[in-house]
Amino acid sequence: METDLAEMPEKGVLSSQDSPHFQEKSTEEGEVAALRLTARSQAAAAAAAPGSRSLRGVHVPPPLHPAPAREESARTPAAAGRAAKMAEAPASPAPLSPLEVELDPEFEPQSRPRSCTWPLQRPELQASPAKPSGETAADSMIPEEEDDEDDEDGGGRAGSAMAIGGGGGSRTLVSGLLLEDSVRVLAPGGQDPGSGPATAAGGLSGGTQALLQPQQPLPPPQPGAAGGSGQPRKCSSRRNAWGNLSYADLITRAIESSPDRRLTLSQIYEWMVSCVPYFKDKGNSNSSAG
């Protein structure tokens, strides 16, 4: 009986080592052990190589492409040369404050051309003594230009008189010019009496008493007077064929000439034909009737 039990495993009974699960597990353990041996051998070979490095005991293999290392080694001399040049260059000066601006003596202010200047008062030239004739014309004062002949403004002429005279004489010149303007206003036809320069010269040489006389007011227009050559005309910038008066001025004169200060349109036309020389030649009953 004992002999039969001892022989049973050999004949038909399977042990735990002969089971398929055990064989599969042993195969996996063998593969893991083989992988560990392979990794250890590779680590030993990499440690023996010159380019290997390790961080905290963990092996890191060298890079597969050493080209970037070559580029860094090639760039190193150029970077070293640039650093040497920067070290040789002098240190840049500290920036200047806005109040301490460095001026270049080569860029001094230049004299302006004639087209960009006007008669300015330069006290340094007025207070300085007479300069020799060899001085350039740019250093001398530019004379003031004369006004145009068409400009007959009293303010501009008074300003010219102030520039010519000085002290008490300038006041006399201004009074003379104002008196001359009043005479021109009173003259018939709106024209200046006599030539302009001759009248101004005569007014200046006539004495201060005649120039300082108060300006006389203009006489009021006479309603009944005919609008001929003796009629005073109002100065106006607009000049028509019959004179300096406008249509509104003629209508006002016609209404003021009537006793009751009321006229119809036909009566106004009749007054124009009878009083204004320009309408005398062109007026008739049909045109005056409107």
From Swiss-Prot:
Biased composition (Acidic residues): 142-153
Keyword Protease found: no
Family matches, as InterPro entries: Fork_head_dom, WH-like_DNA-bd_sf, WH_DNA-bd_sf
Main location: cytoplasm
Biased composition (Low complexity): 44-59, 75-91
Phosphothreonine PTM positions: 117
GO molecular function, one term: RNA polymerase II cis-regulatory region sequence-specific DNA binding
GO BP term, example: regulation of transcription by RNA polymerase II
UniProt entry keywords in alphabetical sequence: Cytoplasm, DNA-binding, Phosphoprotein, Transcription, Transcription regulation
Top-level taxonomic group: Eukaryota
Region entry Disordered, spans: 1-30, 44-239
Keyword field contains Lipoprotein: no
Subcellular location: Cytoplasm, Cytosol
SMART domains assigned: FH
DNA-binding region: 242-290
Cellular component, GO annotation: cytosol; nucleus
Function: Transcription factor.
PANTHER family: FORKHEAD BOX PROTEIN O (PTHR45767), FORKHEAD BOX PROTEIN O3-RELATED (PTHR45767:SF4)
Protein name (record): Forkhead box protein O3B
Annotated source species: Homo sapiens (Human)
Gene: FOXO3B
